[in-house]
C-alpha cells in the first residue's frame, strides 16, 4: 500500500517551507554560516523534536529557522522540499513562507523571497512540479507588523498569489487581521488562514466571514459545530488537514481518534498535507500511510483525498 499511495498523483496545500528543514540540512547551513547550534549532532536535534504542544514546537521551529541567512540557504531549503515532492508524486504545491520569521532577525526580505522563487522556478522547469507561494502573517505579532510585511512584499507581487495566517492560534483570532486581509484582497491576492486547529470553531467562522478565505488550513475542530460543517459541505470549502501534525501536537491524542475520514464521508472537502514534515515525522505519503494503518483508509478514500487536493488548488 505504501508504494501505491506514494505513486498517487497529489497536491500539497499546507506546507511551511521552514518546517521542511531537515536536521542534516540545518547542520550544513549552520556550518556554512558559522552558527553554533544548541545541539551537538543530528541525533541530539532529532530527540529534541519530542515536543508536547504547539508552543513547544514553535520555540524549536524559530530556533531552527535561524540558520537560514542567505538567498542560497532559502534556495537549498526549497529545493530539498521539491525533491521530496518528486519522490512522492506531489505534482503541485502551494507552500507557505513566513517573512517575519526572517526579517525580524535581519535577513533581507528579497534574499529569502528570491531564493525560494528561484527554487520553485527550477521545480517547474526541471521536475515538472507546478506551484504557487503563499505569504503568511504571524498571528502572535500585531496587525501593524502584518501591514509592514505586506507593504514590503507588494513590489514582488508576482512572486506570490495569496496571503495566509499562521503561528500560535489561541488568543489570536482571525478578526485581529481583518484590515490587512482586506488590503491584500484589494491588491488582487487570494486569502487562506489557519483556523480550528487549537482554536475554536468560531475562528473558522471568522476566517470565512471576516477574512473571506478560499480555504481553511487545519479546520478539524469544525466537527464540533454542525452548522459550520453544513456550510463547509454546501460551499465546498477545502480543509487542508495535517494528520501527523495533529497527533504530534496533541490536537488528537492518537491517530485512531482523527476525524479526517469522518469529515470526508460527510462530504467535507478534506485534503492530506504534511504541515512541518521535518518536525512531525513525515511528508505527504507518510500522512497517507498513517491514515491507512491507523484508520483503515481504503484505496477509494485515498483516491478521493488525493483528488480533493488537486481540485482545491488555488494557484494555476
From Swiss-Prot:
GO molecular function: adenine deaminase activity; zinc ion binding
Name of the protein in question: Adenine deaminase
Catalytic center residues: 197 (proton donor)
GO-annotated biological processes: adenine catabolic process; hypoxanthine salvage; nucleotide metabolic process
Gene Ontology cellular component annotations, sorted alphabetically: cytosol
InterPro entries: A_deaminase_dom, ADE, Ado/ade_deaminase, Metal_Hydrolase
Family, as annotated: Belongs to the metallo-dependent hydrolases superfamily. Adenosine and AMP deaminases family. Adenine deaminase type 2 subfamily.
Keyword terms, alphabetized: Hydrolase, Metal-binding, Nucleotide metabolism, Zinc
Record note on cofactor: Binds 1 zinc ion per subunit.
Enzyme nomenclature, EC number: 3.5.4.2
Role: Catalyzes the hydrolytic deamination of adenine to hypoxanthine. Plays an important role in the purine salvage pathway and in nitrogen catabolism.
Catalyzed reaction equations: adenine + H2O + H(+) = hypoxanthine + NH4(+)
Annotated Zn(2+) binding sites: 14, 16, 194, 275
Residues at the site labelled Important for catalytic activity: 218
Cofactor(s), by name: Zn(2+)
Pfam families: A_deaminase
Binding locations of substrate: 276
Amino acid at each position: 500500500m505504501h508504494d501505491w499511495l506514494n505513486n498517487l498523483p497529489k497536491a500539497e496545500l499546507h506546507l511551511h517551507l521552514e518546517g521542511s528543514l531537515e536536521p542534516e540540512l540545518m547542520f550544513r547551513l549552520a556550518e556554512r554560516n558559522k552558527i553554533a547550534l544548541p545541539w551537538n549532532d543530528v541525533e541530539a536535534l532529532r530527540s529534541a523534536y519530542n515536543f508536547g504542544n504547539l508552543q513547544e514546537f514553535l520555540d524549536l521551529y524559530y530556533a531552527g529557522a535561524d540558520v537560514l541567512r542567505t538567498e542560497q540557504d532559502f534556495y537549498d531549503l526549497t529545493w530539498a522540499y521539491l525533491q521530496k515532492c518528486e519522490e512522492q508524486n506531489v505534482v503541485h504545491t502551494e507552500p507557505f513562507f513566513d517573512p517575519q520569521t526572517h526579517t525580524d532577525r535581519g535577513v533581507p526580505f528579497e534574499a529569502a523571497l528570491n531564493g525560494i522563487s528561484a527554487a520553485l522556478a527550477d521545480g517547474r522547469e526541471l521536475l515538472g512540479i507546478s506551484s504557487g507561494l503563499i505569504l503568511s502573517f504571524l498571528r502572535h505579532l500585531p496587525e501593524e507588523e502584518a501591514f509592514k510585511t505586506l507593504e514590503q512584499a507588494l513590489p514582488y507581487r508576482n512572486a506570490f498569489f495569496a496571503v495566509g495566517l499562521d503561528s500560535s492560534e489561541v488568543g489570536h483570532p482571525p478578526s485581529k487581521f481583518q484590515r490587512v486581509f482586506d488590503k491584500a484582497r484589494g491588491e488582487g491576492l487570494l486569502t487562506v488562514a489557519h483556523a480550528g486547529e487549537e482554536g475554536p470553531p468560531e475562528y473558522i467562522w471568522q476566517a470565512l466571514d471576516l477574512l473571506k478565505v478560499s480555504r481553511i488550513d487545519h479546520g478539524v475542530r469544525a466537527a464540533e459545530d454542525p452548522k459550520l460543517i453544513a456550510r463547509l459541505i454546501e460551499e465546498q470549502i477545502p480543509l487542508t488537514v495535517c494528520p501527523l501534525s495533529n497527533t504530534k501536537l496533541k490536537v488528537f491524542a492518537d491517530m485512531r481518534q482523527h476525524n479526517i475520514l469522518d469529515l470526508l464521508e460527510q462530504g467535507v472537502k478534506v485534503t492530506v498535507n504534511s504541515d512541518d514534515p521535518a518536525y512531525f515525522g513525515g511528508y505527504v505519503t507518510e500522512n497517507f500511510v498513517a491514515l491507512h494503518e491507523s484508520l483503515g483508509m481504503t484505496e477509494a478514500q485515498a483516491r478521493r483525498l488525493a483528488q480533493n487536493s488537486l481540485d482545491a488548488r488555488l494557484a494555476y
